[in-house]
Amino acid sequence: MTGGCPTRPRVIVLCGPTGVGKTRLAIALAEEFGGQIVGADSMQVYRYMDIGTAKPTPAEQARVPHHMIDVADPDESFSAGRYARMARPILMDLNEQGVLPVLAGGTGLYIKACLHGLFRKHSADKAVLERLEREANDQGSAVLHQRLAVCDPETAERIHPNDRFRIVRALEVFESTGLPASGHRQAHGFAEDPFDALKICLHLDRKTLYGRINHRVDLMLADGFEKEVAGLLARGYAPELKAMQSIGYRHMTAWLAGGISRETAVENMKKDTRRYAKRQETWFKADPDMVWVDQKEGLEKVPFLVKRFLRYGK
């Protein structure tokens, strides 16, 4: 990596909705900066599920090293916590080797767990939440943010004064448990923001993105997606498994079982993928540190942003 010696390990995050073009750009970045890709996709962790997860092809994986792909069988339980425990050491090791990690994928919770950690939430006190909501209505979010800064300055520093939901939630944690939210995170073994991350999210206008999604589903079918699903069922992976209930796989399973027509399965697959893309965008928009880049400008703009980050930091 270029630049001086950062106080924290550096990571490039490349995220965005499904079908936006993350894989191509991630590989280009890794090649240009001598980096390696760490996948952040909740479905690409599974073996034998290649076409329906839009997993990088063997040829693409041969161009640069990939991590966190094909690390579990479809009948294994896999969570954001397990992902973070596996991916964090990889990010650390790559930094120690002087290799730039490119954390690329569309599963926002996995990215968050890896970069910032997760902590076990206590059961929220509904009465406290309702009272804090009323106070936010009467006094404004900024006033509650000032209160949070007194009892939990670490969390307050990470939350924008206008982010009412997170302010109220953090205050509720403190009032209900006597321990700040930052204390809960530390108590459960997660360091506070151990990485210096440049977060880049690719976006496209809705019409173009949805067109790409529909086309990609057609390509998956042409590449043998139905055969892939039939092969998983033949291996003994039950339709009820969490992995088999994901988008695409549940639709093809329903068709193969005779429950719906092929036409309906394909249309539902496209529709649910579009809905998922919309939810992904909503998730990423909630991150104030995200740098948004039009996908059409990605190959030119993103390398510039990375060079600036490596030289000067954020």
Swiss-Prot record:
Keyword terms of this UniProt record: ATP-binding, Magnesium, Nucleotide-binding, Transferase, tRNA processing
Marked site: Interaction with substrate tRNA: 107
One GO term (biological process): tRNA modification
Cofactor(s) needed by this chain: Mg(2+)
UniProt: ATP binding residues: 16-23
A family per Pfam: IPPT
Domain of life of the native organism: Bacteria
Keyword Metal-binding: no
Keyword Nucleotide-binding attached: yes
InterPro entries named among the record's database cross-references: Dimethylallyltransferase, IPT, P-loop_NTPase
EC supergroup of this enzyme: transferase
Family: Belongs to the IPP transferase family.
HAMAP family: IPP_trans
Stated role: Catalyzes the transfer of a dimethylallyl group onto the adenine at position 37 in tRNAs that read codons beginning with uridine, leading to the formation of N6-(dimethylallyl)adenosine (i(6)A).
Subunit structure, as described in the record: Monomer.
Protein name: tRNA dimethylallyltransferase
GN (gene name): miaA
